[in-house]
Design a protein with these regions (language model features):
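Transmembrane-helix signature of polytopic, membrane-embedded enzymes
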Residues: 3-4, 16-17, 25-30, 107-130, ...
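Transmembrane-helix motifs of polytopic, lipid-linked glycan transferases
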Residues: 30, 94-115, 153, 157
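Short helix- or helix-capping micro-motifs
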Residues: 33, 124-130, 177, 181, ...
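Membrane-interface transmembrane helices that cradle and orient dolichyl/undecaprenyl
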Residues: 112-115, 154-170, 276-284
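Short acidic/glycine- and proline-prone juxtamembrane loop motifs at membrane-interface regions
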Residues: 133, 139-147
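Short hydrophobic alpha-helices at membrane interfaces in multi-pass membrane enzymes
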Residues: 157-178, 209-213, 217, 294
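Transmembrane-lumen/periplasm boundary regions of multi-pass, lipid-linked membrane glycan transferases
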Residues: 179, 190-289, 303, 356-362, ...
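Signature aromatic-anchored transmembrane alpha helix within multi-pass, membrane-resident enzymes
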Residues: 330-371
């Protein structure tokens, strides 16, 4: 009989694992959550919208059970934010910030479930708070801001069950997993790794519970609408992943993939999460939770073998940080090293604070450029666009409003009789999203584009007799239009290279109606 099964039969022992100081630490965890909120809010309006945020807002105007490149939840969050809180950067970014703050608090709670005291809880939560990648992904509306919350909630529920809570809690696991699938399909990777981890760690007996299978059915039912949408649309996510690996993502070796984990989480936090992994495998106390260690290794292997982006495993690390907090607490307690109990957290905090500007835009651009020149290793690239002056995360926050202004100038110079029939065709969803967000105040119509879900939404009712096109190669335009005139150029010194020196064309005399040539503008990536 496994150790976890024994614990399930002995709730008193499971309760005894929770230290008496657990309640006393709650105000300190709350303080860390407040610190997380303060840091994120400090940079909420410093730069502009991130490229994907503009796209998600456009998706929120076309609510559906699926999109070419994502499940429906992120579009729904965008719609809710704008309708409940207003059409501002603050409203769009509030929910991801709250999700990130919840992950900080939940990490401390998971450390408690692992049997950790004050030090374990605070150390794990602090590590999650200060990890540069967590700060970055929680700074803007993104599926990546919510994914750690879904993974961590599932882990917390599972650990509670292992510690003796009612197996009925598996139903909550199913709900969380189902919602996670509607956020990002990589929840499937977590689910597979979690199940395999239970089997490899000797906890496969948990599958004998009817509740875990009911939970699986709940998750499937919640996922089913998006699954049906995918099937009806020819599984576009498969095409997106295949094209991104071939044309967009940086190709890196497994060694570089692993090295990026260290940078994303901060090198000073490496001993903590590695210690957490070791605690799961090598200690008596961690044996009950070995399934989480196996699941992490499987997640890592799957993403490396699938040539995924190196940040894909990041949602898993709060679990290892919580376990690492317990391992560190046990180490300093067993060896009576109080100085280490102070020194390591202090060094970690100092190092983490030093890298906050790489995750949250708290500094003006000029100041950040000077500051970051001394720490170039933290400017990690995940896409194959040439390097620009700013890290990719920040570069994609510049140029959008200016782009809309330039297009507006061009649009309003079109003769009035022709203007009402003139379409605005953007080369990618960021450009189209910028027109859709800033355009109403500038008197612009909604944009069209062949990129991802914009392609699915079609050319609206435009004939193509007059089209303002930017972000598409000139040779493609001359192939389909008899008259192609460059009338402006869009650029921004801090934007991504792909948004530098973008020509703006007015195209007329199409060879065929726009609906006919529309498939040639398709770009699924």
């Amino acid at each position: 009989m496994s150790a976890a099964k024994v614990l399930l039969q002995n709730n008193a022992f499971a309760s005894a694992l929770r230290p008496e100081s657990a309640r006393a630490v709650t105000p300190l965890l709350a303080a860390l959550v407040a610190a997380k909120l303060a840091i994120q809010f400090a940079g909420i309006n410093q730069y502009g919208f991130f490229r994907d945020e503009l796209y998600y807002m456009a998706c929120g105007e076309h609510l559906a059970w699926g999109y070419i490149d994502q499940p429906p939840l992120i579009a729904l969050v965008s719609w809710l934010a704008r309708h409940l809180l207003g059409n501002s950067m603050f409203s769009i970014r509030l929910f991801p910030i709250l999700a990130g703050a919840t992950v900080v608090g939940l990490t401390g709670m998971l450390a408690w479930e692992f049997g950790g005291g004050k030090l374990a809880q605070l150390l794990g939560a602090t590590a999650v708070l200060l990890a540069p990648a967590n700060l970055a992904f929680d700074s803007f509306l993104s599926m990546n801001a919510f994914e750690p919350l879904f993974w961590l909630l599932c882990a917390w529920i599972a650990v509670r069950i292992v510690n003796g809570a009612s197996p009925v809690l598996w139903l909550a696991f199913g709900v969380v997993a189902g919602l996670g699938l509607e956020n990002k399909h990589s929840m499937l990777v977590f689910g597979f790794a979690f199940a395999a981890g239970l089997i490899l760690s000797g906890e496969g007996w948990l599958f004998k519970s009817k509740w875990i299978w009911i939970a699986a059915m709940i998750a499937l039912l919640l996922f089913l609408p998006n699954l049906i949408w995918e099937a009806r649309h020819g599984w576009p996510q498969v095409e997106v992943v295949r094209n991104a690996q071939r044309l967009k993502n940086v190709s890196i070796s497994p060694l570089r993939f692993l090295f990026d984990q260290v940078l994303f989480l901060h090198p000073l936090e490496l001993p903590l999460w590695l210690g957490g992994l070791a605690w799961c495998f090598l200690t008596v106390q961690g044996k009950r939770f070995r399934f989480l260690g196996w699941a992490y290794l499987i997640v890592l292997f799957l993403f490396i073998s699938m040539h995924g982006k190196s940040y894909y495993p990041l949602p898993y690390y709060p679990m290892l940080m919580a376990a690492g907090g317990v391992a560190f607490e046990r180490l300093v307690s067993a060896r009576n090293r109080r100085s280490l109990a102070v020194a390591f957290p202090l060094i970690m905090v100092i190092g983490g604070v030093a890298t906050i500007p790489f995750g949250v835009p708290v500094l003006p651009v000029a100041t950040f450029l000077r500051y970051s020149s001394g720490l170039p290793m933290f400017q990690v690239r995940v896409e194959s666009d040439p390097k620009v002056s700013l890290p990719q995360l920040y570069a994609d926050m510049f140029g959008w409003k200016n782009m809309a202004n330039v297009v507006s100038d061009v649009y309003h110079k079109i003769p009035a009789g022709e203007r009402s029939r003139c379409a605005i065709l953007a080369g990618n969803y960021g450009e189209a999203g910028a027109i859709d967000y800033y355009g109403p105040k500038l008197g612009l119509p909604k944009a069209i584009s062949g990129h991802n879900s914009y392609f699915d939404w079609g050319p609206r009712n435009y004939t193509g007799e007059c089209v303002i096109i930017f972000g598409d190669p000139t040779e493609q335009l001359t192939k389909f239009f008899g008259e192609v005139e460059q009338v402006a150029t869009i650029s921004n010194p801090h934007a991504m290279d792909v948004e530098q020196n973008v020509p703006v064309f007015v195209c007329r005399k199409p060879d065929a109606p726009l609906a006919t040539i529309w498939p040639h503008f398709k770009m699924i990536i």
